[in-house]
From Swiss-Prot:
Gene designation per UniProt: argS
UniProt name for this protein: Arginine--tRNA ligase
Entries under InterPro entries matching the protein: aa-tRNA-synth_I_CS, Arg-tRNA-ligase, Arg-tRNA-synth_N, Arg-tRNA-synth_N_sf, ArgRS_core, DALR_anticod-bd, Rossmann-like_a/b/a_fold, tRNAsynth_Ia_anticodon-bd
A Pfam short name: Arg_tRNA_synt_N
Cystine connections: none
Amino acid sequence: MKETIIELLEAAGTQLKQQGILPADAPLTVKVEPTKDKAHGDYASNLALTLAKPAGRKPRDLAEALVAALPPSDAIRQVDIAGPGFINFFAATDAAAQVVPAILDAGDTFGRSLSGAGEKVQVEFVSANPTGPLHVGHGRGAAIGDCLCRLLEATGFEVTREFYYNDAGAQIQNLALSVQARVQGLTPDDAAWPEDGYRGAYINDVAQAYLAGETVVADDRDVTASAAPDDLDAIRDFAVAYLRREQDLDLKAFGVAFDVYFLESSLYDDGKVDATVKALVEGGHTYEEDGATWLRTTDFGDDKDRVMRKKDGGYTYFLPDVAYHLDKWQRGFTTVINEQGADHHSTVTRVRAGLQALEAGIPQGWPDYVLHQMVLVTRSGVEVKLSKRAGSYVTLRDLIDEVGRDATRFFLAARRSDSQLTFDIDLARSQSNDNPVYYIQYAHARVCSVMRRAQDAGKAFDRDLAMQHLGRLDAPQEKELMNRLARYPEVVERAARMREPQQVAQYLMDLAADFHTCYNAVKVMVEDDELRNARLALGLATRQVIRNGLDLMGVSAPEEM
């Protein structure tokens, strides 16, 4: 319907240009949005207001001219002008109802498009250090990142999901020392415990597995513990593999899988970090000061220059990030999206500046970033801070065990990524309309229940009969529901383009509300065969869109609740 109205207004604008009412070069950028008050129609456009100045006319006068020039259409039953010049459109019932067969015909593909066909996108997300269990912040990144990948795939892009393992550096050394301390019989309360060591109960789990000589399978490698208490390298390799496996198990339970696991250590092993340093030095963008090597990132928009190589010869953490992103570019990913925590904000400018300094043909502003804010977990209104397993934070596994995968995924992705999120465990577990996951899933299950009742009553759905009488879906609640269904493809397209998965979550909440309102207002199981089947068809269309939307969120659509 929205596309139809845009086409009608474009045709009217073209006619006004031919009549000399509009300048020939006036931009016909038509915007049409659903109205908030249905007394003002189903859709509205401000085209007359945007064209009034180039036309040299009052907006309302121009609106009248545009309405007069609209081609006739069976899809529109009424057009009004409101306020200073808004044009309001009332959709004809028959036209609004055509979304029902469109949905039923398309099925699982309704809402999908090929707008990104032929384009490759790499999405890096989670990318947790293999030093402990995944925390709720990683969980939010996993939910947002995976939903974003699903959205991009739904709009035709070829998506590669990538996990970057920071398996080099001081934190890995601290992990190895912590596990070694446990292997040697120390506890976190002992004075000899490593100063920056990890203290969670999982460290003891790793140590016991190491002493038992276990073999760990993680992603691309098998590591067998040597059980030698003094072999720090062996302990390090085993601990990293063990915790990578644990993170993999958490992600599997969360319904998230990756195509590529990239190890930071491989950048050093393959000489890519040294090659990046060499290219930056040869490019003339570095200088020596106080025994360190600095990169002139201020030449590329940073607020100050950054140390690249420290006095002791070690690299700062952003240097391997530059090498890693150069590798992404060289792999042919012209579009890269990094979903990370907001604590990475300071690295965005540095990495982009480093990439520009390489003069490798990488465009400014590459890669894209989606940064999420922190998650606060509450129970009974009180913040939950600790996990028995991790010791210092709430883990993703804690949440999944508490409220299940569906609620965890939906809640973590249902708000704007740049907004702090309060995860209310009590709300996520509740079976009430206040719980958005329950509310949406219940709408799906409710349709399934109606279809079973129809079957049991000997009144199975007759699609042919339903399609002949969709025009009888003329109750205001039915029309509002059909209009909402028609907006789904646009929501998917916009959410993918804007990198905002929460738009799908909000749409599903609105759709569920419209469905429950309609269900409570009009009786489905009436004796009138024509009307009953038309309403069953509307229910089936609603069920399909809910299922499609929940799939984009990585959430199930149960048939019974």
